[in-house]
Every structure is written in structure tokens, then in C-alpha cells.
Amino acid sequence: TFPSPTDQVLSELGLKARSALDCCPIYKFTNFSKGVPQNGTPFIHLCRKVMNMDKHTERIEIFKSTLKLIEQGWYITPSGEQMELPPAMWTIDESKMYSKPFVVDKPKFKKTTIRVKNMDCVEYAMTLIDRGYNPALLNLADLYTPGGLVEYGSGAQEENLCRRSNLVVSLYQFSEMRVRQYPSLDLIVSEDQYPMDERYGGIYSGCVGFFRGPESEGYSLLDNPYGISVISVAAIAGPRIGKDGMMPREEENLTLDKIRTIFRIGMDNGHDSLVLSAFGCGAFANPPAHIAKLFHQVMEEPEFKNAFRLIAFAILDGYRTGLRHNPEGNLLPFQKEFDCVPQNGTTAL
């Protein structure tokens, strides 16, 4: 007997049940090519019923809990201590929306170190902070909706970040509808509003309080929250892809300007490092090999060469890999582009 979705979120027993539901081979197949089990029900429908819908429910409950913690401003850690969250007003005051190109005049570093890591982007940003860096974390944002589909339990990266932090208090102020929907957050409607500009749009959220672990650990509350600044920029959704696996020139040029916007926002706010990801290569189906090349191209442009002490791509291959747009997954194309394929299974920081 498995706990209800709410109990699964809140209890250790529930987490074990969740793991069992996701991993247990419940159905036997008579036709693997069509994915039809013996009872004749299409496998995808069974997945939605037994697994995915439960996950969506759990994510929705986690987000509701996150909103309550943001409102009260503190939580009880796993070790039993009361931990104060970074004041939401800090994040709100340090937030701004960008919609035009601009140039940042700042000193350059002697060189930029490039890393491609197979790990959670938030955890890698925390590692950099512990090592003395001042990173900004890229949020793979939705162009039209702050937080994407977080209220509906989506598993994409932006929604994951919103469940783990107070990022929404920054993003929601740029949506009059969200400000009215969540009066308890005490937000003031910004003059700048969603949707973001398609070419130069981005949002900087300073000192976002991250206080939950990754989904793989049940979004457990952290003993020590981290303040991490976030850059939200939206990739192209569903670009055209040729037989060579590349986007046409129009989409390429648009993506280049989006990448330049990410870099400029990081520079404009004094960050010495960026934690990026496979920009748009999941739900938005951008080709990772081409996206990696475009990042590399922008890094070598005079405006951005050595603008950062470190640029890292933290990439976890999820369920949307091995598809037409990313047959090798998302991690490997970036490793190849930046010559970061691990040797003997190890890589540096």
C-alpha cells in the first residue's frame, strides 16, 4: 500500500514508495515495438496513470509548500534548527528586466576556464560559491510565463528552480496576473512586464534564496540555504532543424543574440562566473551540438573573450534525450565542443 501523493511528499516512507513506483517493472509486454502490455492498454497511458501524474502531483504539492515557506520567511531544517530565509525583498530589489542590447565596460580576466559537468546546476553553483566564486546561474526560462508551468507540476529546469527557491518572487513581479493571483507574497507590479523581448529579453534576479535539494533527493530542505543570483533567458521553442542537425541562419542569429544577452547580464551585475546549461535542448528541442558551437562562438567574440573567470555547463541528461534533435543526449555534444570529455571518469572542478 502506497501513501497518498501528499504523504509521499512529506514522509520518508513516501519517498521510498515513490522510488518503488518509478523503478518497479509492473507490466509485462507482448509487443515491445508498440509498447502494449498484455492487458492491451498503451504503455504511455499506464505511465501517465501510474508514474507521471503522481510526479506532477508531488511537484505541485512541493511548490505549494515552497510558497508557504517563502511567505513565513523561515523553515525547520532536517537537523531540527529554525533557518531564516534570505528576505524576499532583497531578491525583489535586486531584480530587473532587460529588453535592449547594451555594452558593459569592465576589466577582463587573463583567461576563462571552461567546464562541462554532469551534475545539477544549483549544486554546482553552490560548489563555486564555496570555492570563492561569484556565479550567476542560468534559468532556462519561458518567454511568456514567469516560472513556466511550475503550478502544473512540469519537470523542466525553470520549474525545478522555482520549487527549490524564492525565484518566483522576482519573476512574478513582472506579471500583473501573478501579482493579483498571489496577494500573500506582497508583490508590487513592475512597469516591465512579460513577455520578455524575443531577441534581447532577460531578467536578473539577485540573491535568490535556494533552500531545497534536487528532485532526486525529494526536494529535501537544506541545512544551509544559499543565495544565488539567477539570469532568466528563454531559448527558441521548437526551432527548425536541417538534416545536418543545424538550425537555419535566422534561428542561429536569434540564438546568438540570446547568448550575448546572458553574458551581458552577468557582466553588468559584476559576476566572475556563469553556470549555464544545454540552452533550450530539453523541452524546447534545440540541437545541443549547434547550441554548444554558438556558445563557443560568442565566448571568442572580443566583447566577451575572457569576460569571466569561469564558465561552466552543468548538464543532466533527462528523459528528453536520444531524440531527433539530440541523438547523443545533451551532455556529450557540449563535452566534445569544449574538449571536456572526461578521462578515466574524472574531471576537474
Give the residues covered by each predicted segment.
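Macrodomain-like recognition of ADP-ribose-binding/processing modules
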Residues: 14, 21, 29-35, 39-274, ...
